[in-house]
Amino acid sequence: MAGRSGDSDEDLLRAIRLIKILYQSNPPPNTEGTTRQARRNRRRRWRARQRQINSIGERILSTYLGRPEEPVPLQLPPLERLTLNCNEDCGTSGTQGVGSPQISVESPAILGSGTEE
């Protein structure tokens, strides 16, 4: 796979196959012919096993990909530097390239009272 240095594709595919086998080893519980409490307990145990499988899968992938489990937090500029109006000097507020273009809103005096003449 493009862009990976040090990791072979075969190792990654092997990890994916292993995770797939883990998920297939825990099918959803049968919902027929039992009391509501028994079904609820079965679903609760199934969800607990799914959480364990999720954490094992994350550990396997992080081992093969060499990435941390938690994403790196995005560094944002301080709130004091963010502005909502971009009438003058756009791009110097520290938000250049972040988000969508800003749209200036006309004041109510310019828009009128809303009644047609």
Swiss-Prot record:
A single GO CC term for this protein reads: host cell cytoplasm
Give me the ranges of the annotated region Homomultimerization.
18-26
GO biological process terms, semicolon-separated = mRNA transport; viral process
Compositional bias (Basic residues) spans? 37-49
Gene Ontology terms for molecular function: DNA-binding transcription factor activity; RNA binding
What's the domain remark here? The RNA-binding motif binds to the RRE, a 240 bp stem-and-loop structure present in incompletely spliced viral pre-mRNAs. This region also contains the NLS which mediates nuclear localization via KPNB1 binding and, when the N-terminal sequence is present, nucleolar targeting. These overlapping functions prevent Rev bound to RRE from undesirable return to the nucleus. When Rev binds the RRE, the NLS becomes masked while the NES remains accessible. The leucine-rich NES mediates binding to human XPO1.
Q: Which HAMAP family match?
A: REV_HIV1
The identity of this protein, by name, is Protein Rev
Originating species: Human immunodeficiency virus type 1 group M subtype A (isolate MAL)
Gene behind the chain: rev
